[in-house]
Design a protein with these regions (language model features):
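A conserved structural/catalytic subdomain of Rossmann-like adenosyl-cofactor enzymes
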Residues: 142-143, 149-152, 156-380
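Generic structural signal for hydrophobic core residues of well-folded globular domains
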Residues: 3-7, 23, 49, 168, ...
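Long recognition/docking surfaces used for binding and targeting
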Residues: 1-26
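Conserved S-adenosyl-L-methionine
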Residues: 34-166, 171-175, 182, 188, ...
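Glycine- and acidic
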Residues: 5, 29-30, 57, 103-108, ...
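Conserved phosphate/pyrophosphate-binding and hydrolysis machinery centered on Walker-type P-loop NTPases
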Residues: 9-13, 35-39, 208
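Nucleic-acid modification enzymes, centered on SAM-dependent nucleic-acid methyltransferases
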Residues: 26, 30-35
Length: 380
């Protein structure tokens, strides 16, 4: 019939991708609110990464498989560059085909939580000449052991990937009451406050943004020296409440580049969150330990040099002394029988609120100064 002479093998990736997106577009956008990462962004990210035919590549939120396809295309283009006459020379073909096909079959991995989208990703890969073998349906945030147990695919092992390229879902919150794995994430715990006077117990956060947890999950999957290219909302990079996330990124990765994407980057898909691409290289375990140790040393020096704990203890004593004195005054003036009774009066409560507010401001000013000194010392 009409389709008999058609050959998709020779069709370029962009044409196939455009056809697939047109065919599947309403399915993704309408039914699931999922969005394709624009091809221009996918191509840019894959082009700048030094992916080779023996590299092991993963997308932990693979959606329709765009990043995996462009990685495959990059390796296939390299094969064609090395063996340009593969179509007419059988000896070249014997090298050309396994060069990229082994990569597609053994080195490309994708995780997608939605089963129907995962199937669509596999179909997309098949249309583009395979690579679907290691695309699985799973929550991308469960442990590698859980993934291996559920899928019997031993390729999904922590510490084995050379490249992770991903655009994780933004804005969703994982609640610790819903997912037991929250407690296994460093970024699922409340950060340690080095300026706290008393030792703090380790506390699990009530919830954490999915994109933040994916940073840690991707770190776990990478080899030492492996590269992570991840699209993140700018809130992770700029919000003061996210400083602990940026600190953790510094501990785990060498920051290669941060590329700001235009506000309109995802507008064609109906998403308008300002975002950036982070290119990160995983430190060795020793380097991470060295960085953390240096930070602890700076903290220790600053605490000692500023007599921080002694000052805080002195202020606490001063508060208690003033509280006792005020309660005594009220007790005598109003003829109260006890100090606790005096502390229940409206006069004492108003006065005490002002006192605590004044000291809280002093503490905040001291902490701000110490934090600034810490940042300056860290940059030296």
């Amino acid at each position: 019939g009409y389709l008999a002479p058609a050959n998709l093998h020779g069709t370029d990736l962009d044409s196939k991708g455009r056809a697939f997106e047109t065919f599947m577009g309403s399915f993704f956008r309408g039914n699931f609110g999922q969005y394709f990462t624009p091809r221009e962004i996918v191509k840019f990210i894959v082009d700048v990464l030094p992916i080779e035919h023996d590299s092991k590549v993963l997308d932990t939120s693979c959606g329709s498989g765009g990043f995996l396809l462009y990685a495959l295309n990059k390796v296939r283009d390299k094969a064609t560059e090395l063996y340009p006459n593969y179509q007419t020379d059988t000896r070249q073909y014997k090298h050309w085909f396994p060069y990229w096909h082994d990569f597609a079959e053994k080195n490309l991995y994708g995780i997608e939580i939605n089963e129907q989208i995962s199937r669509a990703a596999k179909m997309n890969m098949i249309i583009h000449d395979d690579g679907h073998t290691n695309v699985i349906t799973s929550d991308g945030l469960v442990s590698d052991e859980t993934i291996i147990t559920r899928t019997a695919n031993h390729g999904f092992k922590y510490g084995t990937f050379d490249f992770i390229i991903t655009n994780p879902p933004f804005g969703s919150t994982i609640r610790q009451t819903e997912q037991a794995y929250m407690k296994t994430y460093q970024l699922g715990k409340k950060e340690e406050d080095w300026l706290a006077v008393k030792a703090q117990p380790e506390n699990i956060r009530d919830g954490q943004n999915t994109e933040v947890l994916f940073i840690e999950q991707d770190y776990k999957f990478l080899k030492e020296g492996g590269y992570l290219a991840i699209i993140l909302p700018d809130s992770v990079l700029t919000n003061s409440t996210m400083q602990y996330v940026r600190t953790q990124i510094e501990d785990w990765f060498r920051i290669i580049a941060v590329v700001s994407l235009p506000q309109t980057a995802f507008s064609a898909n109906g998403a308008g969150v300002k975002s950036s691409v982070l290119f990160l290289k995983k430190w060795s375990k020793k380097q991470t330990e060295r960085i953390v140790s240096q930070k602890k040393e700076i903290e220790s020096h600053l605490l000692n040099d500023n007599d921080y704990l002694a000052i805080r203890q002195e202020w606490d004593k001063e508060i208690k002394s003033q509280q006792k004195q005020k309660a005594n005054e009220i007790k005598k003036a109003l003829g109260k029988t006890s100090m606790s009774e005096a502390k229940q009066t409206e006069e004492y409560k108003l006065w005490n609120a002002d006192l605590l507010s004044a000291f809280a401001n002093k503490v905040d000013n001291l902490k701000d100064r110490m934090t600034l000194e810490y940042q300056q010392a860290k940059q030296k």
